[in-house]
Amino acid sequence: MALKHFKPVTPSLRQLVIVDRSGLYKGKPVKTLTEGKSSSGGRNNNGRITVRFRGGGHKQTYRLVDFKRTKRGVPAVVDRIEYDPNRSAFIALIKYEDGDLAYILAPQRLAVGDQVIAGEQVDVKPGNAGPLSSLPVGTIVHNVELKVGKGGQIARSAGTYAQIVGRDQGYVIVRLNSGEQRLVLGACYATVGAVSNPDHMNISLGKAGRNRWLGRKPHNRGVTMNPVDHPHGGGEGRTSGGRNPVTPWGFPTKGKKTRNNKATDKFIVSSRHKRKK
């Protein structure tokens, strides 16, 4: 879908660039495939802020998206493509031959009326899901599982995808958007195609209020705070912080490596950092 620009009648409309969603379904979601969603405002069960700069925003209904594609071997037809406020990608309502309905992530080039299926051997066309081992090398995929049966975890945001680049002793080598190459079990499922709404990266919200509609509050830098609020706070006039960048809790940030999962290091064939050198 194309980007939408506006006549510069106001300063915010001059800056505003959004995705044209005129081709999406305009009604309400299927009620049986939705759940209520309460807003936490960034607070935990003690009422304390655990995630800063969250709060407000429009009330949202959660759509139950099928990341597992559990109904195997049953063809389904795409009934409509919908907007989902909980994610950057669009979702597709599919209707199985036996009448069941489900939401899936809508890939690019998937249209209303297209047939999709999940199974052990499927055609390489957008929306079909199958084990990584059954898909040819070079295939563009999304919604990739890391554990068999857990559901897709990789490449679910708007415009993202992964590519199958090789095979190795029951594993498949997958190249991610970051440049990382990773071993994933061949039995893990993935869906063919790249995720819809690739223009999401080009939008401009135009005004602060649109950020508030999304539940995001103003983000304050540490150097603008008082010493009681942040290690960079205080000082007479404008100061640079006077130390290496740290988080509000004193831990190093801005370039400090935070990965701490040695158990899965063996599955990383090529680091995403190698591409930068």
Swiss-Prot record:
Name the Pfam families for this protein.
Answer: Ribosomal_L2, Ribosomal_L2_C
* Keyword Protein biosynthesis applies: no
Entry's transmembrane regions: none
Q: Where is the signal peptide?
A: none
Q: What is an example of a GO molecular function annotated in this UniProt entry?
A: transferase activity
| Keywords on record | Ribonucleoprotein, Ribosomal protein, RNA-binding, rRNA-binding
Query: Is RNA-binding tagged as a keyword?
Result: yes
Q: Give the residue ranges for region: Disordered.
A: 222-277
At the top level, the lineage of the source is Bacteria
Q: Which is a GO BP term held by this UniProt record? A: cytoplasmic translation
* Cellular component GO terms held in the UniProt record: large ribosomal subunit
Which family is annotated?
A: Belongs to the universal ribosomal protein uL2 family.
Q: Which PANTHER family match?
A: LARGE RIBOSOMAL SUBUNIT PROTEIN UL2M, RIBOSOMAL PROTEIN L2
Output the HAMAP family linked to this UniProt entry. Ribosomal_uL2_B
The role this protein plays is: One of the primary rRNA binding proteins. Required for association of the 30S and 50S subunits to form the 70S ribosome, for tRNA binding and peptide bond formation. It has been suggested to have peptidyltransferase activity; this is somewhat controversial. Makes several contacts with the 16S rRNA in the 70S ribosome.
Self-association state and partner proteins as the record states: Part of the 50S ribosomal subunit. Forms a bridge to the 30S subunit in the 70S ribosome.
Q: What is this protein called?
A: Large ribosomal subunit protein uL2
Tell me which species this is from.
Answer: Xanthobacter autotrophicus (strain ATCC BAA-1158 / Py2)
Gene assigned in the entry: rplB
